[in-house]
């Protein structure tokens, strides 16, 4: 039996094509994945991301606990509502999950992936022992992401308090909604466009989704969410990183807070040793020069360079009208490479792992 978000009946009502996603019955699209993708790049689209796991972390030891279990340092968060992206590492330096943590007036709010929910919760509970901390999973909250160049303006038609806030990127705040209800609205996303991710009581989710539709925000499924994040060069857990992949080879080195040196976070010793020995692989972008489509697990080679790489995520880019991919390759890979696609050797260009941001092509 698949899990469902509170919005599942509404997705079916408006024609959502439902599929199994990490044990959740979620909309893949509502008719055209490409049209939904383009809507987010040019106007505004919305995604039901209520399958994500929200955990509130409270108690006198909340900060020191998160400084221990996260590779990034929550001490960087000094303003309520501010967000931080981090990996949560295991003792071998692999990535248990990637997540966002918000500083709240009462503690911290952590948002982790749905597919890793059980593993993440067990990991956090196990390592909370010895800390004065409480972990509270917020299954009473839904989450809706509104993304695109018109996302903020259209959301403010329903939540007018946003007009006076002018939230910075990676900043959230409680926003007055209907009656005495408040929604937590953060200027974050997973598409490479501006917009909001909104956490709200499950009881308000249906009405809020319909209100967004009424002001012209297009319902979008997980298919478009994946092509958008891939164009933006954003990692997907289980593809670009996992329990056996170091953040140093997953384009996540920037999320590691090495200072102060005395902060002993889980995985520090392992990735410090890896860094000292010299990282052997890197995450790159690939842009296909020939006809075809790049897909995960295809093998990548580069003339004159020993070893081979592998595509971690690949797709046809609706924005660029060509196939793009993220790939883990030996550090010496650069310039032109070759990808094995259906017994053919196709040419691809190695680029930085980001293809489109704010509607503009970067390659």
Curated annotation (Swiss-Prot):
Keyword terms: Aminotransferase, Transferase
Keyword Glycoprotein: no
Pfam family, one: GCV_T_C
Catalytic activity: N(6)-[(R)-S(8)-aminomethyldihydrolipoyl]-L-lysyl-[protein] + (6S)-5,6,7,8-tetrahydrofolate = N(6)-[(R)-dihydrolipoyl]-L-lysyl-[protein] + (6R)-5,10-methylene-5,6,7,8-tetrahydrofolate + NH4(+)
Transmembrane segments: none
Enzyme class: transferase
Its EC number(s): 2.1.2.10
Family per record: Belongs to the GcvT family.
Function: The glycine cleavage system catalyzes the degradation of glycine.
Subunit structure: The glycine cleavage system is composed of four proteins: P, T, L and H.
Protein name (record): Aminomethyltransferase
Organism: Saccharophagus degradans (strain 2-40 / ATCC 43961 / DSM 17024)
């Amino acid at each position: 039996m698949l899990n469902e978000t509170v919005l599942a009946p509404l997705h079916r009502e408006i024609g959502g094509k439902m599929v199994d996603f990490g044990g959740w019955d979620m909309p893949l699209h509502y008719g055209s994945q490409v049209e939904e993708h383009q809507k987010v790049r040019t106007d505004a689209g919305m995604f039901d991301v209520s399958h994500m796991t929200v955990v509130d972390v409270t108690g006198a030891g909340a900060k020191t606990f998160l400084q221990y279990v996260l590779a990034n340092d929550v001490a960087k968060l000094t303003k309520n509502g501010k967000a931080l992206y981090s990996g949560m590492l295991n003792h071998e330096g692999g990535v248990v999950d990637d997540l966002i943590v918000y500083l709240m007036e009462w503690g911290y709010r952590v948002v982790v992936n749905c597919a890793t929910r059980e593993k993440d919760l067990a990991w956090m509970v196990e390592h909370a022992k010895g800390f004065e901390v409480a972990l509270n999973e917020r299954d009473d909250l839904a989450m809706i992401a509104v993304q695109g160049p018109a996302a903020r303006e259209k959301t403010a038609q329903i939540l007018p308090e946003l007009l006076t806030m002018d939230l910075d990127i990676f900043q959230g705040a409680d926003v007055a909604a209907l009656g005495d209800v408040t929604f937590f609205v953060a200027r974050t996303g997973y598409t490479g466009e501006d917009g909001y991710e909104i956490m709200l009581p499950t009881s308000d989710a249906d009405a809020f989704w319909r209100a967004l539709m009424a002001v012209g925000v297009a319902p979008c499924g997980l298919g478009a969410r994946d092509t958008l994040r891939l164009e933006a060069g954003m990692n997907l857990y289980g593809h670009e990183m996992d329990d056996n992949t170091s953040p140093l080879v997953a384009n996540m080195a920037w999320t590691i807070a090495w200072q102060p040196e005395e902060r002993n976070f889980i995985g520090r010793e392992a990735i410090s040793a890896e860094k000292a020995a010299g990282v052997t692989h890197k995450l790159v972008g690939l842009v296909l020069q020939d006809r075809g489509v790049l897909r995960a697990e295809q093998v990548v080679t580069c003339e004159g360079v020993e070893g081979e790489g592998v595509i971690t995520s690949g797709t046809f880019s609706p924005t660029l009208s060509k196939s793009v991919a993220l790939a883990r390759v030996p550090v010496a890979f650069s310039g032109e490479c070759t990808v094995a696609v259906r017994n053919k050797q196709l040419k691809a260009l190695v680029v930085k792992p980001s293809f489109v941001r704010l509607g503009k092509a970067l390659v």
